[in-house]
Amino acid sequence: NAWDTNVDVWHRRMIEASEEEIFQAAQRTHTPYNHVYLRKNTKLEELAKYPVLFYSHPTIMTQERADLLKAYVEQGGTLIIGCRSGYKKENGQCVMLPQPGLLQPLTGSDVREFTFASPAEPAVYARWEDGMESEMPIYHDVMEIAQGAENAKVLAYYTGSFYAGRPAVIEKKTGKGRTIHYGSTFSRANVKQLL
């Protein structure tokens, strides 16, 4: 994913914004924060010490990495991913699977459309069941619950643009943990809400 950030202009725009905003939210809420780089030899024990993992925009996904993340969630972790996740192989080619590709069994989401947020339109938010709204900056995954996904539910719906009323945030429980597919980039405000 580091390679892809350097080459893919779309990905760079999202990852740079999200990483800065996750850091700022953690600092301002006094939430302990650490960077973990997933390598081929990363073990579950290394991830298990973190109750929450933000894997903001993992465009490149391997089966080994997806299996590691699944094991992390099954043992009780919370995995939060953002938009444009899991749609490429290690060689940079798109997978021939619905987005988020190899992560779909974990997320229970099916990305049906995707788009940059239009500067010509009013800002789009996600509205949660309790009426709270979250910022949805830069990019939007327009999702639905994947066919056959068990223990998945929509947490929030888009409020604007042509996809108003469509799922913006989907949660899926797996084992003792859960995965949240947040269909946008991260901001200080929405990270604070997720924490």
What do these predicted regions represent?
Residues N1-Y50, L106, K172-K173:
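Aromatic-Pro/Gly-enriched surface loop or interdomain linker
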Residues E45-A48, S56-L195:
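A conserved amphipathic helix/loop scaffold
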Residues L53:
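Conserved, mostly hydrophobic/aromatic
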